[in-house]
């Protein structure tokens, strides 16, 4: 909607290619757009547990509006597609983004997973610029990140942690030691412990 308005106002001249992203556990929009136009019939789905809980909707009431906007976008010359990703890909992408300082929630991870899948499918070239929609903070769904680090996902999610991405939380200074130290001593002890963990001591 916003891109169509910007084009009408002359702010932009070309419409970028757009992709929606859905999990395999909640994918009614992907199922609709994965078919040729003449064969498309919208059907709701029964959702399965998803880490992207805000998008875990099997029968979105907004679908008629989505379809109307997509139709208008394509008539105006824009391209639209939908990518489907696994729960594993969503969590791996969430952790990957967070490891690089882009603090995202699982819906943001779903968005990045979609970009990676689109590249894998050849729908986005390696040198192309992409803008991802990620508007929530990691703290909103921090429990899923902790499950990833501690390998405690229930089996219905289908998520197994990638050891290379795992960053399990650990105490820097235990509670008993903290209680014994003054504020200044605690600060020094914590800083020293962090430096040692990061192998920065003595550098």
Where are these regions (language model features)?
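Claisen-condensing/thiolase-fold acyl-transfer catalytic domains that form or cleave C-C bonds
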Residues: 1, 87-144
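Active-site/ligand-binding loops adjacent to catalytic centers
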Residues: 5-104, 148-202
């Amino acid at each position: 909607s916003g891109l169509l308005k910007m084009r009408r106002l002359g702010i932009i001249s070309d419409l970028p290619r757009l992709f929606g992203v859905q999990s395999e556990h909640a994918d009614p929009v992907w199922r609709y757009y994965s078919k040729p136009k003449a064969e498309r019939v919208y059907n709701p789905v029964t959702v399965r547990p998803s880490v992207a809980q805000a998008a875990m909707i099997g029968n979105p009431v907004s679908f008629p509006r989505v379809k109307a906007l997509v139709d208008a976008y394509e008539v105006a010359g824009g391209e639209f597609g939908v990518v489907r990703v696994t729960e594993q890909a969503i969590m791996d992408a969430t952790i990957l983004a967070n490891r690089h300082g882009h603090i995202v929630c699982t819906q943001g991870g779903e968005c990045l997973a979609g970009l990676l899948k689109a590249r894998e499918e050849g729908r986005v070239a390696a040198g192309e610029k992409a803008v991802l929609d990620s508007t929530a903070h990691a703290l909103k769904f921090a429990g899923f990140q902790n499950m990833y680090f501690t390998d405690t996902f229930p089996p219905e999610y289908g998520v197994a942690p990638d050891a290379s991405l795992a960053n399990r939380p650990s105490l820097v200074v235990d509670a008993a030691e903290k209680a014994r130290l003054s504020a200044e001593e605690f600060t020094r002890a914590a800083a020293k412990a962090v430096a040692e963990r990061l192998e920065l001591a003595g550098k």
